[in-house]
Regions:
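Well-ordered beta-sheet/strand-loop patches within structured domains
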Residues: 1-186
Length: 186
């Protein structure tokens, strides 16, 4: 007899349309799209872009995911997985208006929204209210900034997810040139 394989339970799922990041600028939209996909490739562990692909982050009970490595004091002595990148030129990120990594805030906003709907404990101190994130409700807009000095601005402009459950969860990103689908499963 073959036992049924347990199916994953989807706790939340949302999609980010990569064709609508900057609707008024084709060039800007391409930069945002490229930087979003590159950030996901770093999570996957292979920064060479190729499509489509899947990237996953598994969080055990009590584990934390931080979008970038500069952490607030309350997270410094905990088990933390980070986005494995600094969103800088040396890692291949493209600039827009002089800022390398433009677009990763849109990815962080998708993560905030989906993780919140899944019941994860979310800490996002810097809202992206200075510019809308198309397709993401305003309350989940998340501003990300990495500074090498690790100062308070970079620690506050981070996204932290904590698994409050007594079971592990996975963030599963399915990415293509057109969209990023994120689901949180148990």
């Amino acid at each position: 007899m073959v036992w049924p394989i347990p199916r994953e339970e989807i706790l939340a799922e949302h999609t980010l349309n990569l064709e609508e990041r900057l609707p008024d600028s084709e060039f800007g939209n391409e930069v945002f799209k490229y930087n979003i996909l590159l950030a996901l490739k770093y999570i996957e562990g292979d920064p060479d872009l190729g499509e489509p692909f899947i990237a996953e982050v598994e969080l055990q009970p009590g584990e934390i995911f931080a979008f970038q490595e500069n952490l607030l004091p309350e997270f410094e002595n905990k088990t933390v997985k980070t986005g494995w990148t600094k969103y800088i030129a040396q890692e291949g990120y493209k600039p827009l208006s002089g800022l390398y990594g433009n677009g990763v805030c849109h990815l962080a906003s998708l993560i905030n929204w989906t993780a919140s709907d899944a019941g994860l404990k979310v800490t996002a101190l810097a809202n992206h209210n200075f510019w809308p994130v198309p397709g993401v409700p305003k309350e989940y807009g998340t501003s990300i900034r990495y500074l090498a000095d690790g100062g308070w601005k970079t620690k506050n402009q981070n996204l932290y997810l904590e698994n409050p459950f007594d079971y592990s969860v996975k963030l599963i990103f399915k990415a293509s040139d057109e969209e990023v689908d994120l689901k949180v499963v148990r």
